[in-house]
Amino acid sequence: DQSFTNPERVGIALSESGAQGDWRLFFLTRDRVRDVTLAEVQRVADQYLVSSNRTLGTYLPTDAPVRAPAPAKVDLAKTMQDFKPQAAAAKVEAFVATPENLDARTQTFAVGGLKAAVLPKGTRGAAVRATLTLRFGDEKSLFGSGEVPGAVAALLDKGTRTLTREQVQDRLDKLKTELSIGSAPGRVTVTLATRRDYLPDAIALVGDLLRNPVFPEAALAEFKQQAITAIAQQRKEPDAVADNTLDRWGNPYPRGDVRYASTFDETVQDVNAVTVDKLRDFHARFYGAAKGEFAAVGDLDPAAVRTALQSAFGDWNRGAPYVRVPHPRVDVQPERVLLETPDKQNATLL
């Protein structure tokens, strides 16, 4: 009742109730608090104040506690009197990214089956970003591959014939390069964020990762554990359950087809079926630079990039012949589907 003496508090309370669905909830809550009984309070306490729903802290006194020292006082004026900032960053060109300017600046060339496009332009810190995509296989040759293609891509940076997993990461750090690898049916994509001077060496490292992976047993075990843990979590999430159901709804393809949408249980089975021998066999059969694309934008030397690509992929003209997997339109009958996700208060509508 005291809140009614403060118009600001009343306004905020009514606004919050309105956001929950009805501004009158504020008054309903007031009436429910007024009418609550001791028995109801006890019932709720017994229901919710259980050991699995609480965090317990224990105070353990000690005669000589070890405490971190207090922060030292700093004389800011004295600290700053000798400060000399770094030289201002060099100005870069004001490149206007119109279609005409992009076409005029872009240089294209081919390295074997690899089509390349580079756009040299000034950037802060000589930054450059690059993407490499290799394409392979078709719906028949990829049939039954399960989770093997994804596992191959996930383990590419876990060691090569000449570099351990730690050495790969050390090399990336030395080259000031961020690298990520992703995959989809019939392709693997590598993205790079680096600097002008390091781009050729980063391309050479990517070539080593793609051509000479060793697929360590420990890395495969780690991949399986992470994948199965993620699936176990998805089983409980409304959005993941809804997405999986929608993907499977009206899907006409048999299990094993790359367009088939697996259940959570089927995905776990496919993950468990992955072996190092299967990874090596898939890599030997499908990977190669016979079909692919490379693109780079930023502060770069086109001639140096071309030389690096030629050295890394010029003689790797192999891999299963690529044919794009068709995705024809599929007529799906409309239907309303309700799915239960126990212990989850949120919901997802698709």
Which positions does each model-derived feature cover?
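M16 family metallopeptidases and their MPP-like homologs
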Residues: D1-D35, T55-Y59, A117-N212, K224-A232, ...
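Solvent-exposed, non-transmembrane alpha-helical starts
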Residues: A68, S141-S145, P200-A202, E217-A219, ...
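Structural alpha/beta core scaffold segments of enzyme domains
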Residues: G113, D270-A273
